[in-house]
Structures are given as structure tokens and as C-alpha cells.
Amino acid sequence: MNPNQKIIAIGSASLGILILNVILHVVSIIVTVLVLNNNGTGLNCNGTIIREYNETVRVERITQWYNTNTIEYIERPSNEYYMNNTEPLCEAQGFAPFSKDNGIRIGSRGHVFVIREPFVSCSPSECRTFFLTQGSLLNDKHSNGTVKDRSPYRTLMSVKIGQSPNVYQARFESVAWSATACHDGKKWMTVGVTGPDNQAVAVVNYGGVPVDIINSWAGDILRTQESSCTCIKGDCYWVMTDGPANRQAKYRIFKAKDGRIIGQTDISFNGGHIEECSCYPNEGKVECICRDNWTGTNRPILVISSDLSYTVGYLCAGIPTDTPRGEDSQFTGSCTSPLGNKGYGVKGFGFRQGTDVWAGRTISRTSRSGFEIIKIRNGWTQNSKDQIRRQVIIDNLNWSGYSGSFTLPVELTKKGCLVPCFWVEMIRGKPEETTIWTSSSSIVMCGVDHKIASWSWHDGAILPFDIDKM
């Protein structure tokens, strides 16, 4: 075969392959159209394709026309049901670590807020850490003087549990130097107290929008729990104090629906003092263990019913759980009266387990260092000293601080009971350490049906920071 014949043969073969390829494509298109039409899903160039992307604060709907995109924003659908929260507390044999934010360690080189009073609260889908910022960052000049409790720069913010209180993930909640927050199953409600000491105001936000307010009724530093409020069947409850920190003050229970106050009642507690209650739901009622900042080293107990009737007294146990306090052996316990004659105090918590009680306390009797949780047999109803369980959370070589309670709802756990959980604040900086600032991180623990070994989950930041050396 001469060269011309070879060229003709190759060209003919190529042309044949090309024609076959075209035929196959035509057949493919015909088959596709027939199949789509038979299935009722034939596409029209004038039709639309809608894709929805669920984001944190909105649903983004993208409508794709032929050669055109139209983007519109539609309201994110809210949860349909209120949480029940009438289940009993689960029995806890020990407490397992749930989260640790390490905020101060990260903040030595990261954009982390200076905070105090962190606490945790949960919705049906997530738990969040709330905290009161000082309007400044760690290792920055504006952190100077942040040992002060109340200032116009303080705000309530939140992050998903386990995240550090950093600039990039924090969500603004309220202007506040005292606060509480909880979720009713549909939306978050926050109560943020701010303003001058003699005319402070509490703003109730629901779904991020101001809905109601509470003005100071005693003109002496209106304040609230610094931990989670409690929602039962859509009604949310919290406790507030107005008046002196070192003598008789005035105390009120508030009840709100969808962020609007629908009830309140004064607590009659002559001779007793209530501040910074740590509350949780249990069998349809709200149970609180509070702080007596006047005289008692035993903790006030408050049990609230849905009609705002209440019982108030002191944790009966013959072991004191406030700080400062005396020796355990010298304490007798009382269900009705403050004992110990030690002023000041620290926010704390406990959980009723039948007639027993789990109670948290600092290991030190005189300072906010170390932390342990102990189980006292019949400690809810009797002056019992029978300590049947002890778990160390922070050893006594490291700083602790406030502590408080919350529960995991059944929507999260799929259990038939509410899991008891607590957090412990670890305060660093002033007044105990040589820094220009005061801030804290936290460790969070949740009840399990197994014993858990003691350990020290302390803060671990190495101080002072660079800003403290200038």
C-alpha cells in the first residue's frame, strides 16, 4: 500500500469513528430525555433549582434559573416545642469531664476575652458557655483593672461549650455585669443586669430581642444568679437579689414566658441571706442551692413550684460547703438557720439525690483554691456527716472560684432523666497573683453511673503575661 492509500485508509477510519461517536451521543440524549419524561422529572430551561443551606442565624435559599442565580434570605424556622424538663435527676455515681476551655492559656497569644462568671446552659440541640466579658482581651493594656466587678464595658457573651471565649467564635447576648440565661426549647432567654449601683436595670432578651425589664426595687446593686436559669414546660424561673451583701437584703423569684415576665414573688427569709443561686429542674420543681454572704457557712436552699410558692431554708447536712468556713468536725448543721458566723462566701451548688445530696466546695477552708464534690448520705433532710463519696476536681495547689449547676435535657441525651452537671471557674490574676488583670477559665463535669477517679483539671496558665512585665 502506497503512502496515499495509507492516508486515505486512516482518514476513512477516523471519519467512521467520528460518525459512530455522534450517533452514540444522539442515542444517549434521546434515551435520557425519554427516561426523564417517563419519570415526570423533565427539566425546563425556564424552571428553577432551589438549594437551601442551613446556617446559624438564617436559611439561605439559592434559586438557580437558566444562566442566572437569585439569592434570597428567609427566616430560620424556630423549634416547635417547649422542653418538658419535668423528669427527675439521674442518679450519679461520679462526674466525668465534659469540657475544658483553657481560655487563659490560649489567651497568652490568642484573641481571648478577659472574663469572669462563666456558666453553662443547654438547649435541645447544644450546650453553650456564657461569660461576662470586661470589654478587653488578655495580654492587652485594656485588661488593666479588670478585677472590678461592675463597669459599663461588661457584656454577656457565649460560645459553644468547649471553645475558649475568643473574639472569633463568641456571640453577643446582652449588656451586663450580672446575668443568667436558659433555653425553653424554642429560643434562648437571657437576663442581663447593668447600670448604676443604685438604679440598675435587668433587661430580659428572648431570641436576641429585648422583651421586658426589671428595675432595681431596693436601690442596692440588683443582681442575679451567674448561672443557668430553669425552664419547665415553657416557663422560665430565676432568682434575683437587691440589697446589702453583708446584712438583710431583698430577694425575688421571677417567672417568664417567651421572655415576658408573667409572675414574681418576694422571698421571706428574715435572718437569712440569698445570692447567686445555682438552680436546676427536678421532678417538675426548681431546686436551688445559693450563697449566704452574710453569716452562714451552710448554703441556703430554695425549692420553687410552678405557682411560685416556695420553701426556703438551709442545706441540712452537717458538713459546711461555703468558703470561708470552719472545721467540718466543729459544724453541726441546720435545716433552718445560718451557722458558722463566717462572712463573705462564694457561689456554689449541689444536687438532691433522694434524701442524699452531692455538694461542691473548695478544698481550702479559707481561700478559693482546690475543688471537690462530696456525696452526703441524707444530707438534704438531716444534719448528717456521713460522707459516702468524694471526687477531687482541682487539687489544693491551684486556684478555683465560682461553681454552678445545669442539666442535660432529655432531648440531648435520649434518657428518661435529667443528667446533673456542674462547672467550676478557675480564677487567675488579681488579687492572688501579680498581674494587672483578673480572668478565668472553666472545667465542666457531668454525672455518670460509674465512679470517676480524682484528678486535677486546673487552669495551667503560666503567669505573668508580657503585659504584666511592662
Curated annotation (Swiss-Prot):
It is found in: Virion membrane; Host apical cell membrane. Residues 32-86 are annotated as: Hypervariable stalk region. The keyword Disulfide bond applies. Glycans are attached at residues 39, 46, 54, 84, 144, 293, 398. Coiled coil: none annotated. It is a single-pass type II membrane protein. N-glycosylated. This is Neuraminidase. The gene is NA.
